[in-house]
């Protein structure tokens, strides 16, 4: 079970918070000891793409922790003020320097243990020029039989790629959902 993030100070006035169950609620929340503001701790969204060029998918080798040196789809935390698709596109540009046309939402995976929801969109690469950013050691295209399956950074990436290649074999893409405890 996830240990919740602990909010220690009010985001409104800066006073210390205490954890208690507010009226008409069913769980403990961080409540400001001075102004009474209730602070909710919610999952973080990770957004990314499955960029495709012909029969190949684009993967990035991580230059940062966690999982430094392992391969992943271009993805990262969604920012305030952007849609999930906009965030996925931004991350694809930041991590791989890839130019893509965004397509449909492809997978939504809840990672309960760390309080995250991972959303991946299919994306069609417009060309093969790549310019990996500071969070990537390199970016490369892989056919299914070339994917470094034992060197993938995250279970959500493996699951998304497995679904993608299966759907491609079937000739029809759908939205996939799942949970990782």
Q: Positions of the model-derived regions?
A:
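Active-site-adjacent beta-strand/loop module that shapes the phosphate/pyrophosphate-binding cleft
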Residues: 109-132, 140, 160, 165-168
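A short coil-to-beta-strand element that immediately follows conserved catalytic motifs
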Residues: 20-21, 99-106
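Conserved Nudix-box catalytic region and its N-terminal flanking loop in Nudix hydrolases
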Residues: 52-94
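Acidic, metal-coordinating catalytic segment for phosphate/diphosphate chemistry
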Residues: 2-48
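Charged phosphate-binding loop/patch that engages nucleotide di/tri-phosphates or the phosphate backbone
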Residues: 168-181
